Amino acid sequence: MRINLQACFPMLDKIIIESIVQRSVALHLQAMMMLPRNWWGKDQTIINKGRLHNRHFLDDALASERPVVLLITHSAGLDAGLLALAPYYSLQGIYNPLTNPVIDYLVYRGRHRFGAIPLPRGSGFRQLINGLKNGQLMCYLSDEDYGKELSVFAPFFQHQKATLAVLPRLVQKTNAIVVPMIAHHDSDDDGVDVHFFEPLQNYPVGDSVIDATTMNNAIENTIRLQPAQFTWKLRLFRTCPHEGDTRYGQIERGEINVSDL
């Protein structure tokens, strides 16, 4: 967490970095404690706890009658935020199945509330594309480093990051509008604040690096709103642009500095 924060916000001193780390850990733990309520509590309770900000960005995109992709950032309020949307919008998205089938079923059932459609990773994009064409919102997360395969290196907080290059092809195929989104856990009332941002403009242009940079810039903007809400434990800068060990391993051995990411 600290390495990622230092890399993304080099202007902050160690005291501020540590305060963001502690705040982020607390927010994620609090949000996790709310999962049973979110997944199995009363419907009206869930609806009342959700607050949608700048909703017009999403509604205007839907009014265009084009498919819509939600570019979602990993955050403390992620699960609760999607549940806050589900009563009003038809959602679909990819998730990673858990190894324990019982727990996986419980998680799937909770996320399926209000008709949302979680699709196991590996299901393929055909079902997602069909859902988009039928008016379902596609929930797409692309802030994590998934390695070189299917990725290009593009700036993310001024560092080269392996960035999935799948979304531009999906958008080009479906003529979809991409609306960035992040969900914040509210520690005061255990609610969730879902923030929408202006859709990506001139996207895609057909250049994989330019398109990846546009997407990364949009994700950066969602993070800057409240940095402590972001899931900083993600392996953001795992893959080295050149052959060799992961960049985190290189930092641990003192071969490179955080500023060299």
Predicted regions and their residues:
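Hydrophobic alpha-helical segments typical of transmembrane helices
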Residues: 1, 81, 106-107, 166, ...
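Non-catalytic C-terminal accessory region of glycerolipid acyltransferases
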Residues: 18, 22, 59-64, 87-88, ...
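A conditional alpha-helix N-cap/helix-loop micro-motif detector
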Residues: 48-52, 75, 100, 118-121, ...
